[in-house]
Amino acid sequence: MGKYTLPEMPYAYDALEPHIDAKTMEIHHTKHHQAYTDKLNAALEKCPAEIQEKDILDILSDISSVPEDKRSAINFNGGGYDNHRLFWNNMKANGGGEPGGSIADAIKDSFGSFSDFKEKFSSTTAVIQGSGWGWLVYNPRSEERRVGKECRSRWSPYH
């Protein structure tokens, strides 16, 4: 048995309707996310124990520490595993709309307004062909906030 398991959904598959239908959520959870979980575990089994013992975020943040012949599989499947986990945990029923609090302040400071952020996010991620992810990312070292896109499909926003 591998280290990672398919996380339980924090809400029902139909909770995001009408924006995302229940069947799409179920397929992404039980098929896609499960496949990333299984393939990540299979790739990690072939790595040294010190890699296997790390958290996926630590592995993805230091992907060069992974044996070269395993990097691509771990980067791809670890990214797919964690991107889905982030997605499930950042969506909620009756969510959406303009944020408040510190995230709203940070968006305003970095992009001018929430409307400007949405425009930047949309224009940056619209060029992703096929599968891919777009993220609002924050670098605590430089305090930079930016919209990141990952065109290499499900790889990680952590590197």
Which stretches of residues belong to each language-model region?
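Positively charged, low-complexity/disordered segments
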Residues: 148-159
